[in-house]
Each structure stands twice: as structure tokens, then as C-alpha cells.
A protein has these predicted regions:
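A generic secondary-structure micro-motif detector
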Residues: 5, 65, 156, 191-192, ...
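Non-catalytic, alpha-helical, charged scaffold/linker segments
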Residues: 278-309
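Structured loop/turn residues at secondary-structure junctions
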Residues: 67, 154-155, 218, 411, ...
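Short acidic, Gly/Ser-rich segments with clustered Asp/Glu that frequently serve as metal-coordination loops
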Residues: 156-162
Length: 674
């Protein structure tokens, strides 16, 4: 039985009061949108969302993804009514050390499924979670996977380019488990939305294959009706376009309406406007941080309903476990967060192959041995060699999620965020590929994954100017330096925010993939070559790659000079060693696939590989700064300082100085400087 509409409106006003008061107390934040969206949040949280208050991480729960993170006061207030936050927590909004930061940060124990703020990404995460739920349902059945994924978006998210990718993919896959509320209040931070957009959003989503329902987003009955219809939808994702009022219930200092005003979007109501608003909504400005008694009742009632719903679901789950012990064991393993078990001896590598081809060999084994892994590509599977995975499975398509390859189309950012969302859902391991130069499209997703500590795998191929004939638009130069900065940035757990690997040959690629799959704490970036790379000298202990940098076999004792690189430049350094040794120069070659891992080793180990006072020469196909931290103050780096050029890659090697002969020449000159 549904709650009385008067009480529901009172509850929405309670959320409005709390949201406005949080912003007012912090003297910082966004009250207007939060006040406008309170009706939907209240209906969803008090009557529809299925979760276990006593077990917030229950795998069978519905998931709610907020996209406009600036509307955090609405989320925190709604979660406070559910018992996840105290009034003291709300009072500490945006303060040091509080559990209520300005934009929500992933916190499953308090009901927050995703960090949000950069507009557009939140609903892409939700779409990814919806794919994961369908993928797992195909393997485990509907008893264990029957939940819904709810997303909440704003005008800003619709304007963001990523909404195109999410709209297309979710519609194409028929994600009927995805229900998205579009808070359409026609106001944004600096203008009314009509200044920058005049499209028919309803028709746009219908064209993508969505079920679109348009309602008054502040009307309880219409919200219920829309949610009922969305839950019954069998073939399409649903977009509920709720026309809401920015700053609903707000009054100015003079007592006139402050609704639908740009000013309420991103600043406290302030002074008498705040006082008038709280009184108008039925609160006490002197004691605003309270939950009304009748509101407590409806949420207590929902908690009791949920006990019954969850008990029935968990009983059914227990029966399923008895009937399906092997699947149950798999499910527990998949949701454990532990690294999957892989027999890496099954990987067969071909000496001299491109590391992208070596990656394909690893992916083929992963496709066979990790049944909960999803691999994706942005329309490049036959080039980035994620087809090594695809050849052992099939693509995920509408109506059939038994495959494990996610075809994203040309949408790198959408693909990345959806893969992150798959992992946020839980139960899956996600990896995705594209050209390294197009990692630029993905940077916002890399950052949000790093912030949330989601161990997704980024596969970036065609790693340098050796892309060749395609020319500078497709030849990464600055990209490696950019992503390696993320190795230096720490997450809130004190770990390197992203683990980065650029292996030197096929066998080192296997070790790097092993390390990537074992890394369950942070995202991993794997950077691979387009062209074949000579095998490192016989006897090289590839397992040492786990230390980030290590001495390659055949290196001399007490070297006069140390040569260091990652990727294909290691073999280029090796090519210059013979001539250097013929001149009586003792040489050590160091492969450094991961500077971040290397910096995490003991000072003694670091000193044993790259002594501080040694003469160190580095070679990188990227910017010199990529290696300057490793060569140190006495070192020298040969790198690119311009964009690349269009020509066969062997011609570019000659023209740009990436040959054994130039290594000899540059090292001799470097040593002569002493």
C-alpha cells in the first residue's frame, strides 16, 4: 500500500529543508537542483528501491547512480531518511574529514554506488552496471540477478557528449533493467538551458530505442506511475523525463518566489531567503536538521517492508545455492574482489612479435580461464588485438548476454565509463582497448576510476611514432608522460592511483598482464606496440618486471653507463650495446615497464638497479620528461620533442634517431661530457 500523498510531499519538503540547510551551513554548494529533485528521490527511496538496510553490499540490491554530483545534498538527505547518515553528518557537509564531501564519493556502506561530479559519467557508469547485471544473469540466472539499475541525470549530463554514447549503446542493447530519471528543470549554472539547447530530448532517446515517459517530476502520483511502467518494461531502457522546478519551495528575502532562478543553482539561498524558505517548507530555521515524525514513519515502514522483501529474496537465493553449488562457488569467487586464478603457463608467445599480438595471446587465455571477464573495444578489436579475446567468445548483443565481448563502437569515453560501471556493479572483471593516442578521449574516466580505486584494465596499443604512415594525428608522443603522472598521484589509500606497464617484448607482456590481473586495488594501463620487437637477451628474468624495473640479461658488472627504457626502446638500446662494448665500455641495460612499481621497491633495490651517482642514458619514444625521473640529475634522455610524421616506421626510426647506431653515438657523446 502506497503512502499518503500529503505525507510524501512532506517528506520531499523534509529533504529540501535538509539540502538547503546543508548548503547554508557550509556556505557552499548547490541547493536549487537538490530541492527540485527531492520528490523523485523520496518516491524512489521510500517505495521502490530494493536494498537491505542491514547489508548494504548485498549483491541482489537495486543500485542507484547519481550523475550530477553537485546535487549531493539531495542524495545525503535522502540517505539520511534511510538511516545511512546522521544529522551531524549532514551538518559537516563539505568539511575536512567528513563523510559528506561536496560531491559524493564511492561509499557502499552508506548507499553511495559511485563517485560523481564530472557530468555525464555517472549515468555511463549506471549503463555499465546494467550490462554487468545482464551478463551475470546469463550465467547465474534470474534468482540471483533480478535487480534494477537506477540513474539520475540532469540537463548538464544530457548536454555532455557522453550522453550520445550511453543513449546509443543502452538502446541498442535493450537494457530494460536500466531506469533513468532526467531531472529537466531547464536551469544550469550560468544560463537557462534554452540558451544552449533546443533539441527534442524525448524524440532523441526514442530514436535510440528507449522507452520515454514524460511527467511532472514534482508530482508523486506521476512519478509512481512512471516507475511502475519502467519496471514492467521488457525490451528497452526507460528514460523518465521529469519536468521539475529548480529551487522548488524557495522564497526570496522579500517573500516572493525564488523558484526557477539561476541564482539558486550554485550558491546558498542566504540570509532572509533561507529563513523564509525553511519556514515556507514547514521547518524551523533555528533547528532545521531534523526528520519529521511522519517522515520517520514512512521510512520505518519501508524498512519493515524491505525486511520481508529481502528475507524472501535471500531465502530463494539460499535454495538456488543448494541446487547450484558450483555456480554458487563461482559467484562468491567473482564477487570476492580477489584476483582470478589464471594458469599463465598456457600463454604461448612468439619471439619477435608486436606486444599488441603478445597481448592478444594473453587475452585468449583469459577468455578461456576467467569466465566473468568482459573485454571491450572502441571499434578496433582487429587492430588493438582485443580480438584475441573475441575469438574465444562472442559479442554481447540485444537479447543475448552470454557472450563476453562488449562492442562499444567509436566511443572511447563511454566505453571506459561503462567498463568501470561494470566493475562497480561487482562480479565482473572488465578490460577495454583502443589506440594509445585516443586515450586522450578517456582521461576523465581514467581519473574517476583512479579516484574510486576500480581495478579496470586499459589496453592501449600503437604506442609511439612507429604507427608510421598514419602520421602525427595517430602517433602518441605526450601520452605516456601524461599517464605516468597518474603513477605519481596517490589515491586516498596511499597507493599509486594507476598502475602503468609498457612491456619490452612478448614475454615481458605476459608478466605485465599477470601483474595487471593480480592488481585488484587500482586501475591498470597496459601500453603495447604496433610493430614487432626483438626478444630481450637469453636468460632475462622476466619475473623481475614485478619490481617495475630490472637489469636485462647480458649486462656487464660495474657498468660505465646504464641504459634504461621501456617498450620497444629497450631492444633499440640493446642494438647499440655491441658497438659500445667493442669500444671497451661496460654497459648495463634496464627495462623499466612500470616506474610506479619501481619506486615502490626498497631504496636498496632501486640503488642496485639505477644507482644515484651512475651515468644513466634513457631512450623514450615519448617526451624526454617520461624518463627524466629515472635517469636522475646526472642522466640524459633521448626522446621526441615534436609531433611525429607520416612515413614507414623504419624510415622514422632512422630519421628520428631510434637506431642502435644512434644509441652508440649519443652514449659516446654523453660519456665524453663527463
Amino acid at each position: 500500500m502506497m503512502n499518503d500523498i500529503k505525507v510524501m510531499n512532506h517528506a520531499a519538503d523534509n529533504i529540501r529543508i535538509l539540502a538547503a540547510s546543508m548548503v547554508e551551513k557550509a556556505n557552499s554548494g548547490h541547493p536549487g537542483g537538490a530541492m527540485g529533485g527531492s520528490d523523485f528521490i523520496n518516491v524512489l527511496f521510500s517505495e521502490y528501491l530494493v536494498y537491505d538496510p542491514a547489508d548494504p553490499t548485498w549483491t541482489g540490491r537495486d543500485r542507484f547512480f547519481l550523475d550530477p554530483g553537485h546535487m549531493s545534498p539531495m542524495l545525503y538527505a535522502g540517505l539520511a531518511l534511510r538511516g545511512f547518515f546522521s544529522m551531524e553528518d549532514l551538518k559537516q557537509f563539505r568539511q575536512w574529514g567528513s563523510v559528506t564531501p561536496g560531491h559524493p564519493e564511492l561509499d557502499l556502506e552508506r548507499g553511495i554506488e559511485n563517485s560523481s561530479g564530472p557530468l555525464g559519467q555517472g549515468h555511463a557508469l549506471a549503463a555499465g552496471a546494467a550490462v554487468a547485471e545482464k551478463f551475470l544473469e546469463a550465467r547465474l540466472g534470474s534468482t540471483m540477478m533480478q535487480h534494477k539499475i537506477y540513474a539520475y541525470i540532469s540537463d548538464g549530463a544530457v548536454e555532455e557528449e557522453i550522453s550520445q554514447g550511453v543513449g546509443r549503446i543502452a538502446g541498442n542493447l535493450g537494457l530494460n533493467n536500466l531506469i533513468m530519471f532526467y531531472d529537466s528543470n531547464d536551469i544550469q549554472l550560468s544560463t537557462e538551458c534554452g540558451v544552449v539547447m533546443n533539441e527534442d530530448t524525448e524524440m532523441k532517446y526514442k530514436a535510440w530505442g528507449w522507452n520515454v515517459i514524460k511527467i511532472n517530476g514534482n508530482d508523486v502520483a506521476q512519478i509512481r506511475e512512471a516507475l511502475d511502467a519502467a519496471q514492467k518494461e521488457q525490451d528497452r531502457p526507460t528514460l523518465i523525463i521529469g519536468k521539475t522546478v529548480m529551487g522548488k519551495g524557495a522564497l526570496r528575502a522579500d517573500g516572493t518566489s525564488y523558484e526557477a532562478c539561476i541564482n539558486t543553482h550554485g550558491a546558498p539561498l542566504g540570509g532572509d531567503a533561507y529563513v523564509n524558505t525553511i519556514k515556507h517548507l514547514g521547518g524551523d530555521p533555528e533547528n532545521a536538521f531534523v526528520i519529521f515524525d511522519d517522515v520517520k514513519e514512512i521510512y520505518a515502514k519501508r524498512a519493515e517492508e524491505l525486511k520481508k522483501i529481502v528475507a524472501e529474496r535471500k531465502a530463494a537465493e539460499a535454495e538456488w545455492r543448494k541446487a547450484n553449488p558450483e555456480k554458487a562457488a563461482l559467484m562468491d569467487e567473482w564477487f570476492s574482489g580477489k584476483a582470478p586464478k589464471v594458469d599463465w603457463s598456457k600463454v604461448e608467445q612468439k619471439a619477435g612479435s608486436a606486444t599488441r599480438a603478445a597481448s592478444a595471446a594473453c587475452l585468449g587465455v583469459l577468455a578461456e580461464q576467467v569466465p566473468n571477464m568482459i573485454c571491450a573495444s572502441a571499434d578496433l578489436s582487429n587492430s588493438d588485438k582485443t580480438d584475441g579475446f573475441l575469438k574465444k567468445t562472442k559479442s554481447i548483443v540485444r537479447g543475448d548476454f552470454s557472450g563476453a565481448f562488449f562492442q562499444a563502437g567509436v566511443a572511447e569515453l563511454t566505453m571506459a565509463d561503462m567498463c568501470i560501471g561494470m566493475m562497480l556493479h561487482g562480479g565482473v572483471v572488465a578490460a577495454m582497448g583502443t589506440f594509445f593516442v585516443f586515450s586522450d578521449y578517456m582521461k576523465p574516466a581514467v581519473r574517476i576510476a583512479a579516484l574510486m580505486q576500480v581495478p579496470v584494465k586499459f589496453i592501449w596499443t600503437h604506442d609511439a611514432f612507429r604507427v608510421g604512415e598514419d602520421g602525427p594525428t595517430h602517433e602518441p608522443v605526450e601520452q605516456e608522460a601524461q599517464i605516468r603522472l597518474m603513477e605519481k598521484l596517490k589515491n586516498h589509500a596511499g597507493k599509486d592511483s594507476v598502475r602503468v606497464f609498457r612491456p619490452a617484448d612478448a614475454d615481458e607482456t605476459t608478466v605485465c598482464w599477470k601483474l595487471a590481473m593480480e592488481n585488484v586495488e587500482t586501475p591498470t594501463a597496459l601500453i603495447f606496440s604496433r610493430q614487432g620487437i626483438a626478444k630481450l637477451p637469453e636468460g632475462t628474468d622476466y619475473e623481475q618486471a614485478a619490481k617495475g624495473a630490472y637489469i636485462v640479461a647480458g649486462s656487464d658488472e660495474n657498468p660505465d653507463v646504464i641504459l634504461v627504457a621501456s617498450g620497444s626502446e629497450v631492444s633499440t638500446l640493446e642494438a647499440g650495446c655491441e658497438a659500445l662494448r667493442a669500444d671497451g665500455i661496460k654497459v648495463r641495460v634496464v627495462s623499466a615497464p612500470s616506474e610506479g612499481l619501481f619506486r615502490g621497491q626498497s631504496k636498496e633495490y632501486q640503488e642496485s638497479v639505477l644507482p644515484k651517482n651512475a651515468k644513466i642514458f634513457g631512450m623514450t619514444a615519448g617526451l624526454p620528461v617520461t624518463l627524466e625521473g629515472l635517469v636522475g640529475a646526472n642522466g640524459k634522455v633521448w626522446g621526441l620533442e615534436s609531433f611525429g610524421f607520416s612515413a614507414p616506421y623504419k624510415v622514422l626510426d632512422e630519421k628520428l634517431g631510434y637506431t642502435g647506431e644512434n644509441v652508440y653515438k649519443q652514449v659516446k657523446a654523453f660519456l665524453a661530457e663527463a
